UniProtKB/Swiss-Prot annotation:
GO terms for biological process: cell differentiation; muscle organ development; negative regulation of DNA-templated transcription; negative regulation of SMAD protein signal transduction; negative regulation of transcription by RNA polymerase II; negative regulation of transforming growth factor beta receptor signaling pathway; regulation of cell population proliferation; transforming growth factor beta receptor complex assembly. The N-terminal portion of EID2 is required for nuclear localization. Signal peptide: none annotated. Residues 18-34 have a biased composition (Basic and acidic residues). The modification Omega-N-methylarginine is found at residues 59, 75. Residues 170-190 form a coiled coil. The gene is EID2. Its main location: nucleus. Interacts with EP300 and acts as a repressor of MYOD-dependent transcription and muscle differentiation. Inhibits EP300 histone acetyltransferase activity. Acts as a repressor of TGFB/SMAD transcriptional responses. May act as a repressor of the TGFB/SMAD3-dependent signaling by selectively blocking formation of TGFB-induced SMAD3-SMAD4 complex. Heterodimer with EID2B. Interacts with the C-terminus of EP300. Interacts with HDAC1 and HDAC2. Interacts with SMAD2, SMAD4 and with the MH2 domain of SMAD3. This is EP300-interacting inhibitor of differentiation 2. Residues 38-71 have a biased composition (Low complexity).
Amino acid sequence: MSKLPADSSVPQTGAANGDRDVPQAEVGRGRREPAPAQPEEAGEGAMAAARGGPVPAAREGRMAAARAAPAAAARGAPVAAAALARAAAAGRESPAAAAAREARMAEVARLLGEPVDEEGPEGRPRSRHGNGGLAALPYLRLRHPLSVLGINYQQFLRHYLENYPIAPGRIQELEERRRRFVEACRAREAAFDAEYQRNPHRVDLDILTFTIALTASEVINPLIEELGCDKFINRE
């Protein structure tokens, strides 16, 4: 038997497996080409795309909206309940309580107000003595940061006083402590000046003693009480 050449093509029939229209690959060096899409398959794909069109998408959208509605209502329920509670509390509030709350708000507004600056003898701004308290502290000036954030200062103050009623008393306590501290410093300074006129050599030791006592009274003792260490210290 003679051998066939390597590039000879042998036609094969696809009658056994039903592939009559699919061209067969060559035996030699050829590649099998993909079969073109049949008209029946193209028609089935178009029908499937038509079935999966806007109707299922609309149905899914309605189902998603129905699922999201109870969750949104559950999230908004606490906010609405809090608003109703505040409105009911405002309705039950007596005129005396309303007047007291307005007085507290006015007092806190006065304490938190910005000081009017003056020019000192050295050309530096100096706060007036009438604007004492927390208003002299620059990091508590809230008006400019709140205005940048778009928050009304009076609304913020009212919300703070309604939710934290202990704040006015705490601010007044800090103001009173600051006033006593300033008065003690001024009295001690006057005493030092008088003592220096009589005995200049002893003033340095008195200054050191006063500094240590002031640090202990204003810093160390409150820190010890805050940490709860005063229970372990023998006061005797």
